[in-house]
Design a protein with these regions (language model features):
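Sec-dependent N-terminal signal peptides
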Residues: 2-33
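N-terminal propeptides/low-complexity segments immediately following signal peptides
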Residues: 31-65, 555
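Signature of exported/secreted
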Residues: 39-46, 73-79, 84-86, 90-388, ...
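Short beta-strand segments that buttress and anchor functional surface loops
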Residues: 271-279, 312-313, 411-413, 471-480
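Short, well-ordered beta-strand elements
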Residues: 310, 422-424, 496-506
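Surface-exposed amphipathic alpha-helical segments
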Residues: 336, 340, 345-349, 398, ...
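Secretory pathway targeting signatures of secreted, lumenal, and periplasmic proteins
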Residues: 384-387, 391-444, 478-479
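Signature of long, low-cysteine stretches enriched in small and polar/charged residues
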Residues: 442-494, 546, 550
Length: 558
């Protein structure tokens, strides 16, 4: 029976591997050649046969809302992305993990978390070449005050970070990542069994999000407890959705986690956690082995002990081998993590100081190139161009695979399936009085696509309320033997700053892609219109689709 939890965590889990890709960028320059789809307008694009089954199988799994109608010269509101609705979840085939008590309660603790990783990462180097392999070592540490609030509507947490840092070493190259001063007051919600960290008044960068997300997140540790009295040496299975959340994967195909009460002494219990899991993450297979212990308060005796959360200490060793996906390298690593939770009496004062410091830092950092402000919420990521040529808040299903002087390249991955690819390129500045016309954009596209060009399906021009003009041209054509669709956007602000955004996808995935290109464009801010004008509208009432933990009716492991 396949078990699945989805909600972003698995797509971003073991986030230091994303950092590893950046550290060793030259080594991965030719990663995944069999599924590469180039967005350079003048280059031929041939989709690999190997990509189609996964995408088509996943497309059958969900049917997002169709794209909205085409604008023709109307005035648009300033950036205000509204994401396509999530498909109706599959009915659960087995019960989910037991929910915590619902009476409203609040508790503040200090949590210290350490993660040490060693192993290797690998990526394909070509059809006839062996994978490129690089050694990796990670040293990550976290120290924060966590206030957990449990209500009838679920669990939320506020984390005030004293420290959050990681050092990643790949093949001798080192990169240090630390949570910024203006991003240390973090809110966390549970989307199913996936902890989703976010800022209340802004947006985290992908690097920050990757840093904060780890296996065995402290917010999930209580899901290891049985919720009933148990005797020493008695074992119980950990619910499938909780196990997937703890391991930060999408699907458990076989195996699982099991907990066993080992000792009860002086009001304290020790629980052993073991398991072997085969599943999938990001649409690729993964194999995980787990062995560890957790310590928790207990009442009763060795014949009938009631384990009372929260878990105060966890020591876990993991071994995972995960195949390379469309957006990240594969890895074969061993990890050791330690989490220690202690009650904290001065939480209120520290939280107030943290919030004050965050607000002050946000004020100092106003403007293009600084963190995008606005109503933050889970499922959105901020990207600031290194040269301050644009600013972007986007759906976290877009994954960056290249970020350099020539532009930004992202892939849209929905439930493990590669749906589309996008390039964002800053163009030379133009006279503000003469933004490119539809005819000029159409002519340039037809020339650059050359033999791939088929026909222009639709062209439109619109102006946002912040003064940014957008030319949008949708083109149908062929790449190899497959019908493709290219959607080109050229954005121009009042000061003449220009940005080209091109999305490409197979026509068979058009419905699944929906309005993702429009939502991406809505999140872009250019220097001439200022980041703040876009920031306040990014937090639209409609959030990204909740990808909550659930059990599908059948396996979706490739």
């Amino acid at each position: 029976m396949a078990r699945r939890t989805s909600g972003g965590m698995a797509r971003r889990s073991w986030g230091w591997l994303v950092v590893a890709c950046l550290v060793a960028a030259p080594a991965w320059a030719e990663s995944e050649p069999e599924s590469e789809v180039s967005l350079a307008a003048g280059e031929p694009v041939v989709a690999a046969d190997g990509d189609r089954p996964a995408a088509e199988a996943a497309a059958a799994e969900a049917e997002p809302a169709a794209a909205s109608g085409e604008p023709t010269g109307e005035t648009l509101a300033a950036p205000e992305p509204a994401l396509a609705s999530e498909p109706t979840p599959e009915p659960a085939a087995e019960p989910a993990s037991p929910e915590p008590p619902t009476p409203e309660q609040e508790q503040t603790d200090r949590v210290r978390f350490k993660l040490d990783v060693a192993g290797e990462i690998f990526a394909p180097a070509g059809r006839d070449a062996p994978p490129v392999r690089r050694p990796i070592v990670v040293d990550a540490r976290f120290d924060f005050l966590e206030t957990v609030r449990t209500t009838e509507s679920g669990i939320t947490a506020r984390r005030c970070y004293r420290d959050a840092a990681a050092e990643v070493r790949v093949d001798g190259a080192s990169r240090a990542t630390r949570l910024a001063d203006d991003a240390r007051d973090i809110s966390v919600v549970l989307r199913g069994t996936t902890p989703a960290p976010h800022l209340e008044g802004g947006f985290l960068s992908r690097e920050e999000l990757d840093l904060l997300e780890t296996p065995f997140d402290p917010l999930l540790l209580d899901r290891l407890l049985p919720g009933r009295s148990v005797a020493v040496a008695e074992s119980w299975p950990v619910a499938a959705d909780a196990a997937a959340g703890l391991l930060a994967i999408d699907t458990i195909e076989s195996g699982g986690l099991e907990a066993t009460l080992e000792t009860v002494e002086n009001g304290e219990a020790t629980v052993k956690v073991t398991g072997i899991v085969d599943g999938a993450a990001d649409g690729v297979p993964t194999h995980v082995t787990v062995e560890g212990t957790v310590t928790v308060n207990a009442s009763g005796d060795s014949t009938a002990a009631m384990l009372e959360g929260p878990v105060m200490r966890a020591e876990v060793a993991l071994r995972e081998r995960r195949e390379a996906s469309h957006v990240s390298p594969g890895f074969d690593v061993e990890a050791r993590l330690t989490a220690v939770r202690t009650p904290h009496a001065d939480a209120g004062r520290h939280a107030a100081e943290s919030a004050s410091g965050t607000t002050a830092a946000a004020r100092v950092g106003a403007g293009m190139g600084s963190r995008r402000q606005g109503t933050g919420r889970p499922g959105f990521v901020w990207h600031g161009d290194a040269a301050s040529r644009y600013d972007l808040v986007y759906d976290d299903r877009w994954r960056v695979i290249e970020d350099g002087v020539e532009g930004l390249v992202m892939r849209f991955v929905d439930r493990g399936a590669l749906v589309a690819q996008c390039s964002v390129t800053a163009l030379p500045r133009a006279a503000s009085q003469s933004p490119p016309s539809i005819a000029e954009v159409e002519r340039d596209i037809e020339k650059s696509l050359a033999g791939q060009f088929g026909r222009i399906e639709h062209s439109s021009e619109a102006a946002r309320s912040d003064g940014v003009r957008i030319v949008r041209v949708a083109v149908a054509g062929r790449a190899g033997d497959l019908p493709f669709r290219w959607i080109h956007h050229v954005l121009t602000d009042a000061a003449g700053h220009r940005l080209a955004v091109t999305c490409m996808l197979e026509q068979s995935l058009e419905k699944r892609f929906g309005a993702a290109d429009r939502e991406l464009i809505d999140g872009i801010s250019l220097p001439g219109n200022g980041a703040d004008s876009a920031a306040e509208t990014v937090g639209a009432p409609m959030g990204p689709p909740d990808r909550e933990a659930r059990v599908p009716s059948e396996s979706r492991t490739p």
